[in-house]
């Protein structure tokens, strides 16, 4: 393969990947509007998202949400379950377009001493005797010749870059 062929093939592959990503995003957007279509017909007016939004603000700090608790946003947990049956009939795949509520749930009260949700991990030092070599050796690999290694080091140490005027 020549360099031009590699560049062209890479460009085509990147284009195909980008088109797939765009197609998935468009499909998700269509599903979202399909689910919201019936709700907008009931309201008959454009909602003001700054005032009437049912979505709680997403916080990057999980501790802030857990401190305030889900009681701060009482309508958030109930508004998404009140979809009309007509909206469900129009769009059968509406069940997956509801926003996740995992950021409003508190973690289970188990053991507060263990952080990061993991169990205690025991570390053991490994000695050379504990490590077993694979059966059959290393096949065609040879031992490193120290004379050849030092000769290669000297050859590279003597090489110098030469700059010329352009």
UniProtKB/Swiss-Prot annotation:
The chain crosses the membrane at residues 6-26. One of its GO terms (cellular component) is membrane. InterPro entries: FAM163, FAM163B. It is found in: Membrane. Keywords: Membrane, Phosphoprotein, Transmembrane, Transmembrane helix. It is a single-pass membrane protein. Belongs to the FAM163 family. This is Protein FAM163B.
């Amino acid at each position: 393969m020549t360099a031009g062929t590699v560049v062209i093939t890479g460009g085509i592959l990147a284009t195909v990947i980008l088109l797939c990503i765009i197609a998935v995003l468009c499909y998700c957007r269509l599903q979202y509007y399909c689910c919201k279509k019936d709700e907008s017909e009931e309201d008959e007016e454009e909602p003001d998202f700054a005032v009437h939004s049912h979505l709680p603000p997403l916080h990057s700090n999980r501790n802030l949400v857990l401190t305030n608790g889900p009681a701060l946003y009482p309508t958030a947990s109930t508004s998404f379950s009140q979809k009309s049956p007509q909206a469900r009939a129009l769009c059968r795949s509406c069940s997956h377009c509801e926003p996740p509520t995992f950021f409003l749930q508190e973690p289970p009260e188990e053991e507060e001493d263990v952080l990061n949700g993991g169990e205690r991990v025991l570390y053991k030092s490994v000695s050379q005797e504990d490590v077993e070599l694979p059966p059959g050796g290393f096949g065609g690999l040879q031992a490193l010749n120290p004379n050849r290694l030092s000769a290669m080091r000297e050859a590279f140490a003597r090489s110098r870059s030469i700059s010329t005027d352009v």
